[in-house]
Amino acid sequence: DGDGAAAAISAAAKLLTMRARGDRLPGDVVISTHVCPDAPTRPHEPVPFMDSPVGIATMNAHEVGEEMDAVLSIDTTKGNRIINHRGLALSPTVKQGWVLRVADRLGTLLETVTGEPLVTYPVTTQDITPYGNGVYHINSILQPATATDAPVVGLAIVAATAVPGCATGASHETDIAAAARYAVEVAKEFGAGQLAFHDQAEFDHLVARYGSMAHLQTMGALPAEQ
């Protein structure tokens, strides 16, 4: 179940190679991930999930920094019957409890990298709330959105049928490579100011009209559950 980590490390290796050759990107790129050699599995519908001995809040504290202006979260998202596509799928942008529209340029870049039409997937309110609140989440791909005010987009590595990501033989190297290439392309354009994860004016208008949704980034009125 290490597709996301492998993609992140691959993107880091590519950026280091580019830098060594004098091809430096404008802006800073922060790449963070975690690798656990003995992660447990836990029951989840429709297939078992890979769990972690470290809580999501702890991982967010180490992986999501205040200096980040935007976050691209890469994660295996195969254990569901919602996404019926093999390859990569892009989430809508999530910011401070709001699910915003899919960023046009992010979608165009994904089409360029994969050579296929853009595939996106539905994000529920539950999916953008913190783990530990007792509700169903499709997976942890958008958990970084609970730890930052910056816009977050999930890049899901997906399958055409429900596949346990923790199963052996379930990783597809070409999809991981495409995810890494996409991350590099996003970093190039975002750092150069040629790409936005969201429309800031539109977001400000939503908040002015309907109010803050930042309470969805918290446990709300009840204590955390196991």
Q: What is the role of each PLM region?
A:
Residues 35-51, 140:
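Short, electropositive alpha-helical surface patch
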Residues 2, 47-48, 56-58, 89-100:
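Flexible, glycine/proline-enriched loop segments at strand-loop-helix junctions
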Residues 29, 33-40, 78:
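Acidic, glycine-rich active-site loops and adjacent beta-strand->loop/helix elements
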Residues 47-72:
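A glycine-rich helix N-cap at a beta->alpha junction
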Residues 21-25, 62-66, 144-149:
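Solvent-exposed alpha-helices and their adjacent loops that cap or buttress functional pockets
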Residues 70, 76-223:
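Active-site-adjacent substrate-binding region
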Residues 1-34:
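Alpha-helical metal-binding/catalytic segments enriched in His/Glu/Asp
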